[in-house]
């Protein structure tokens, strides 16, 4: 059974949280960003997460540098695992495609930088967490520190998750992330982030000209996205702010 092989691989790779859900749970995503747009005939979603260690976000010295390196190494791990899960599914006769953790990105019709699929939403529908006021996936064990990888497949897999969890979500009165955000990018009632406000403040991309990116985005969003993916991939983007993750009291 393919599900047993997925479970075995997840255990062997020490993936602490993962889940599987039917694709119908993401039927309300925007056109162009639905699972079927990437892999026609998708029936099942697989999403999994690995955390950045808590202490990385608490380091008084070299904190941003250590966060930067930790996140980049986790992205490589997650992307590699997504490819391996996809290969496992194809060995069993299904089609499967990885959904990478960060890059490549696109620019949608509103001029907003977005992933090809909403991985945070995938994490929620597969049951490994809920979306918090900071717009991130929060988990009762790892808080906001989970980084995500995912796979789409035409295999019809049983819905499951590991471990079984019941998430209460953010306390109603908590505004720690909202008040800490230096550019007021967090919309707690909508559980969303004004991503261009956030990136405009935190992202440092020494190899990418922001003025050129904005020019391309105005006239050819697809070219702008390709330029960004080539110039700001992996280590080529440095974030100076992670307060919405570091200060989140939810979970561990």
Where does each model-flagged region fall?
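Non-catalytic, usually N-terminal nucleic-acid engagement modules in DNA/RNA processing proteins
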Residues: 1-78
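Catalytic cores of enzyme domains
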Residues: 29, 74-252
């Amino acid at each position: 059974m393919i599900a047993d092989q997925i479970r075995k691989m997840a255990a062997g790779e020490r993936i602490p949280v993962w889940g599987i859900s039917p694709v119908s749970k993401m039927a309300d995503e925007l056109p162009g960003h639905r699972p079927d747009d990437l892999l026609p005939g998708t029936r099942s979603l697989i999403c999994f997460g690995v955390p950045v260690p808590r202490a990385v976000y608490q380091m008084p010295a070299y904190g941003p540098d250590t966060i930067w390196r930790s996140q980049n190494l986790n992205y490589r791990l997650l992307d590699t695992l997504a490819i391996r899960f996809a290969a496992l599914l194809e060995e069993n006769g299904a089609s499967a495609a990885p959904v990478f953790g960060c890059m490549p990105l696109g620019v949608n019709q509103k001029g907003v930088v977005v992933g090809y699929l909403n991985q945070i939403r995938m994490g929620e529908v597969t049951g490994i967490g809920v979306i918090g006021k900071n717009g991130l996936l929060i988990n009762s064990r790892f808080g906001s520190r989970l980084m995500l990888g995912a796979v789409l497949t035409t295999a019809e897999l049983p819905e499951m998750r590991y471990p079984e969890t019941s998430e209460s979500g953010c306390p109603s009165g908590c505004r720690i992330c909202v008040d800490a955000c230096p550019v007021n990018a967090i919309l707690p009632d909508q559980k969303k982030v004004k991503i261009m406000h956030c990136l405009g403040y935190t992202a440092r991309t020494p190899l990418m000209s922001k003025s050129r990116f904005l020019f391309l985005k105005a006239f050819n969003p697809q070219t702008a996205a390709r330029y960004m993916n080539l110039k700001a991939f992996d280590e080529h983007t440095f974030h100076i702010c992670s307060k919405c993750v570091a200060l989140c009291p939810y979970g561990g």
